[in-house]
């Protein structure tokens, strides 16, 4: 996931596309523009941590990725959490599954969402974000701006 965040920060589309199972380049320009625009507000990412659980089949996993967004002009990092499903590629690397989510996978993520560890991680991330925004008005304003 560090490679993912670095590719986003650098607008490195070659690396970014290779991180996904589809390797689809049709939206490459759209993502490049989005990442360039984000660079105005986001200076980077830090403290990337992956919490994984086995997937539905061998060579697959679900991951909850904790990371902190570094907004430009804001001192306090913004705690964040994202969920992904990854599949091991033929070369042994992991790729983010960007295909249409099957009913089976949807059900699997629903089951994971009630797992005590997943619920705790989500709660801790939300609480950390709330505390960070309470402590830093600039962060609160930036987060609200980015939601628009």
Residue spans for each PLM region:
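Short solvent-exposed beta->alpha transition segments
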Residues: 14-67, 73-78
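Short, charged/polar low-complexity linear motifs in solvent-exposed/disordered segments
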Residues: 33-35, 80-82, 112-116
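Intrinsically disordered, low-complexity acidic/polar segments
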Residues: 72-76, 95, 105
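A short, surface-exposed beta-strand/turn
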Residues: 79-96
């Amino acid at each position: 996931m560090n490679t993912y965040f670095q590719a986003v920060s650098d607008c490195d589309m070659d690396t970014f596309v290779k991180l996904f199972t589809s390797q689809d380049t049709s939206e490459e320009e759209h993502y490049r523009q989005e990442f360039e625009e984000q660079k105005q507000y986001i200076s980077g990412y830090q403290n990337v941590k992956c919490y994984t659980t086995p997937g539905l089949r061998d060579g697959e996993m679900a991951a909850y990725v904790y990371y902190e967004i570094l907004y430009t002009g804001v001192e306090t990092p913004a705690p964040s959490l994202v969920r992904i499903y990854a599949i091991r590629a033929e070369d042994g690397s992991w790729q983010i599954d960007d295909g249409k989510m099957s009913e089976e996978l949807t059900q699997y993520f629903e089951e994971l969402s009630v797992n005590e560890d997943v619920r705790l991680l989500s709660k801790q991330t939300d609480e950390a974000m709330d505390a960070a925004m309470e402590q830093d008005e600039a962060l609160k304003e930036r987060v609200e701006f980015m939601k628009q």
